[in-house]
Amino acid sequence: MSPAPAATQAPVSVSLFDLSTDAPVLQGLRLVSHFPEEALAQSLQTSCPGSEEQISPERRPFQGALDISEKLFCSTCDQVFQNHQEQREHYKLDWHRFNLKQRLKDKPLLSALDFEKQSSTGDLSSISGSEDSDSDSEEDLQILDEERADLEKPTRPQGFHPHRVLFQNAQGQFLYAYRCVLGPRHASASTYCVVPLEESELLLQNLQTGGPRDCVVLMAAAGHFAGAIFQGREVLTHKTFHRYTVRAKRGTAQGLRDARGAAAHSAGASLRRYNEAALYKEVRDLLAGPAWAKALEEAGTILLRAPRSGRSLFFGGREAPLRRGDPRLWDIPLATRRPTFQELQRVVHKLTTLHIHGEDPRETSRLDLPQTHRKRVRERKVIEEESKVPSDENEALGQNKEAPTQGSESEGGDGSQVELELVEVTLGTLDLREFDVFPKQRRRKRNKRERKQDLESGAQMTLSQQPKEDEALSGSAPLRPPLDEATSPCQSELWDVLLAACRAGDVGMLKDRLTASPLHPGVLPLLSAPLGSGGFTLLHAAAAAGRGSVVRLLLEAGADPTVQDSRARPPYTVAADRSTRNEFRRFMEKNPDAYDYSKAQVPGPLTAEMEARQATRRREQKAARRHREEQQRKQQEQEKQEQEEQQRFAALSDREKRALAAERRLAAQLGALNPQTPDPAITVSNIPRCWSCGMSLQGLVPFHYLDFSFCSTRCLRDHRCQAGKPSS
């Protein structure tokens, strides 16, 4: 066995923008990533050992530049044609197909006359005959075609990357750089042919100058667009667009589905089509702008990444921003993610990175990945043996028919019976999960009415009316304040009395009880004691019931507004109305340091000046609302009066309308002589109106014919039709 190759050193990565012209790495560069014809032929010979003796002169690789022949000639059948149609018809003949097989098998070719003679005598197997012969011949042709493709295709050596260029410097180091950042492509350049001398010098010059100075990068995919203009490493400008054009759970754009003839007519499909058109317009307007158009014209390198279906964004239509065949235009030779500005920066950084190897990377790849040579040989004997398998199996099955009887006789002779028991075993794999999976439970949202009922039930909760669930949660302990002082029967009675007074708003009884607090030490602890498992205090009950005076009295007596119930709610948040909440704010203004009001969730103090301003603002709002309502009422009356006058005028005859018009003209003349304040009723009745519908013509340009005036052409046409005159 050959010893394993030594581990190669990892290549060093250097940015092209960090290299200067006099860098040691760039001294004595020469281009080594081209393939002469001799190297190509040698690679073909070494790819298949022993193939030199098998390959006929006709199948040897063509020496010279590869191009498409324009001659009307078939090299297989040695036939000359008059036109392309005759040449295409020849390729469909059995004679041409037979000669192709003969050529692939290295057998002599037949002329047209010999082929007709042998086919008429039956010496040749029919190319399109029975199914067996046809399938065999087609399989042979396919296998030989694969062998020919393996032998004749220009296999490139290991370690060669078509999008990169390999250089070697004076120190013997190998430099790998991406071709797209080393200037425009040459017209006669080819991937596997010799690089022209002019392009070789251009590549060396661009590498030594530090890569592209002006570069435009454009990416578009799935409704996303990203573009940037780079000057060296610096970003001059960039722009991104995003439109919803991809169909849900499909990953394809809407336009691609429409192009297949399955256009959807839903609202979502229409929205996606609109977004496609909007994205097309936005990108075209951006690239047609002065800054981007100038950058595309002066850039030395243009990098593009777009799917085949989305390239019309850059090449289609009139005044396309990019031109096909532009030598500066390159496809991005990297796998890219979603088009974003960060992805553009990553692509430019990746493409402008120079990889420096200590050894030839092609040799390293060849040693690391040895080539495996495969031979595809079809043997008729193997097929014949496989065809005999069914008959052999039938014979074996016939011989085995007696086996069960013999086995049963032997078992009967031995007297031993074998019992088989079928056991079903269930294997659980839930314990192998990394995380526990629980079904997601949806919380039902309660409406305002349910929340209000909860507050009322909390306010009316007493010790004797606690639900049975509270008994289960609190154990066997009675629903009493968790205080030692409240264990006596007198304390329980006092608690019930205070709670009933808070709910009913009995301020007098509370004053009598609270004024005796210095004499009765059991009253003061009950003010802030929670009520059972619900956690309601006396202050909670009074606030939920909307008793503002009771809340003020309890706060002045020493009730703590920071005590929370079982749902972590202070008394301020359960207040029934604004007036009750204002009592907490007034107490905060008088006693700012008494409690932690942030814990009590009281927003701020309420001073007398603030209340005065609020009262003034409410009065102004009320006056404005009354004035607005009065204006609306007057407007409605005017509209009603105008509608009645319009209906009355429309019901008049033409004679009466002429009389009213004469009176209106006379009144206008008298008003000009004696100007007075007009009466609103007279003004409404004497204003000019449409002769057909009676609509007021004030502020409108009327339509006239003869002595009649109309508000619209429709009324004019209706009046003419009624008068029996033509409308033209």
Curated annotation (Swiss-Prot):
Sections of the chain in a coiled coil: 608-659
Highest taxon, organism lineage: Eukaryota
EC numbers for this chain: 3.1.-.-
ANK repeat extents: 493-526, 534-563
One Gene Ontology biological process: ERAD pathway
Positions with biased composition (Basic and acidic residues): 380-391, 610-656
Keyword Phosphoprotein (UniProt): yes
Subcellular location as annotated: Cytoplasm
ZnF C2H2-type: positions: 72-96
Matching InterPro entries: Ankyrin_rpt, Ankyrin_rpt-contain_sf, ANKZ1/VMS1, VATC, VLRF1/Vms1, Znf_C2H2_type
Ranges annotated as biased composition (Low complexity): 120-130
Cellular component aspect of the GO annotation: cytoplasm
Bias (Acidic residues): 131-140
Pfam families: Ank, bVLRF1, VATC
Keywords for this protein: ANK repeat, Coiled coil, Cytoplasm, Endonuclease, Hydrolase, Metal-binding, Nuclease, Phosphoprotein, Repeat, Zinc, Zinc-finger
Active-site residues, record numbering mapped to chain: Q254
Xref: PANTHER family: ANKYRIN REPEAT AND ZINC FINGER DOMAIN-CONTAINING PROTEIN 1 (PTHR16036), TRNA ENDONUCLEASE ANKZF1 (PTHR16036:SF2)
Family membership noted in the UniProt record: Belongs to the ANKZF1/VMS1 family.
The protein's name in its UniProt record: tRNA endonuclease ANKZF1
GN (gene name): ANKZF1
